[in-house]
From Swiss-Prot:
The lineage of its organism: Eukaryota, Metazoa, Chordata, Craniata, Vertebrata. It is an enzyme of class 4 (lyase). GO terms for molecular function: lactoylglutathione lyase activity; zinc ion binding. Belongs to the glyoxalase I family. Transmembrane segments: none annotated. It catalyses: (R)-S-lactoylglutathione = methylglyoxal + glutathione. This is Lactoylglutathione lyase. Zn(2+) binds at residues 34, 100, 127, 173. Regulated by oxidation of Cys-139 in response to the redox state of the cell. Results in the alternative formation of cystine or glutathione-bound cysteine, the latter modification leading to reduced enzyme activity. GO terms for biological process: carbohydrate metabolic process; glutathione metabolic process; methylglyoxal metabolic process; negative regulation of apoptotic process; osteoclast differentiation; regulation of transcription by RNA polymerase II.
């Protein structure tokens, strides 16, 4: 007999839990440290993520032989960033949920260069999410800054959350964690 499915056709809560294992004790100090997005123009991306979303550049790494740079951003106080190079790198790579922007040198000057955001065929990567105290206030500010919206807070069936796009077209969900229970 087939297992009952929720209305969505996805896994039931029980089925989802049955697919999961308890964490091995050896993984107790693991953490999700970063997600990486390739960017065409680091100047535009750094401006967007710092000025528009309020993130802090916590580490920059250049790889001249391979012709690329990494920019790590997080919601951290810039005064907490260590000054000494090795300590700064270790500190940056021990933060939770950082955003790594990878820039392959020269893409900013190539008019044919673009990256797939995963939200059109073939679908894949979807979005990152930013928690904010007030979605409507944040979106009002984004509108004033000329940010491109995929979905405004009152559009569609899921009210109270929004999706914006960064300079490369990646989607960013804007949500209030305390309000999400009414949507899920």
């Amino acid at each position: 007999m087939a297992e009952p499915q929720p209305p969505s056709g996805g896994l039931t809560d029980e089925a989802a839990l049955s697919c999961c294992s308890d964490a091995d004790p050896s993984t107790k100090d693991f953490l999700l440290q970063q997600t990486m997005l390739r960017v065409k123009d680091p100047k535009k991306s750094l401006d967007f993520y710092t000025r528009v979303l309020g993130m802090t550049l916590i580490q920059k790494c250049d790889f001249p032989i391979m012709k690329f740079s990494l920019y790590f951003l997080a919601y951290e106080d810039k005064n907490d960033i260590p000054k000494e190079k090795d300590e700064k790198i270790a500190w940056a790579l021990s933060r939770k949920a950082t955003l790594e922007l990878t820039h392959n040198w020269g893409t900013e000057d190539d008019e044919t260069q673009s990256y797939h955001n995963g939200n059109s065929d073939p679908r894949g990567f979807g979005h990152i999410g930013i928690a904010v105290p007030d979605v409507y206030s944040a979106c009002k500010r984004f509108e004033e800054l000329g940010v491109k919206f995929v979905k405004k807070p009152d559009d569609g069936k899921m009210k109270g959350l929004a999706f914006i796009q960064d300079p490369d077209g990646y989607w960013i969900e804007i949500l209030n964690p305390n309000k999400m229970a009414t949507l899920m």
